[in-house]
């Protein structure tokens, strides 16, 4: 038997989770369907922006800016720091901690506002009795949800380039670039969106 809601939001990124919370605050029974899994294979709300986009790139950018300030700017303030080193593992650990805290914060807001959260890939499959039918697949399991209103907030994915395989070794997507454990000597960035520009920084 299908679970029934007033509003179903497909996508748990910044557009989706905010819409779901607001719908619930306005008194609609609301569910958010999201398929994202973190590198450990666990569901993680927040979409590309939080998990493999704007937030982690800003965290790493801040670490890089701090390193640059120690190397080049602190002396102007009368602060001398010797033997400054980069610990990329620690930088990545900090970045991952920021992601985890923010994802947990979204889950808390869902609970506080009574937004149901279903993990899996949501797909509109039709209408029945004035309601939209949504099939949610997670691994080998499928369930059905019905909702009077549907908000599609599925975000984006990196665009594949013809004849170029993303192996996350030499050719990286945003997720691979944000997990690099060594600083590359050279890096070419294709794309001038927010993530691309921050990678170039």
Regions found by a protein language model. Give the residues of each.
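Glycine-rich flavin
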Residues: 2-5, 21-28, 32-183
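N-terminal Rossmann-like FAD-binding beta1-loop-alpha1 element of flavoenzymes
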Residues: 7-32, 196-201
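Conserved G/P- and acidic residue-centered "switch" motifs that form tight phosphate/ATP-binding loops
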Residues: 13-16, 114, 191
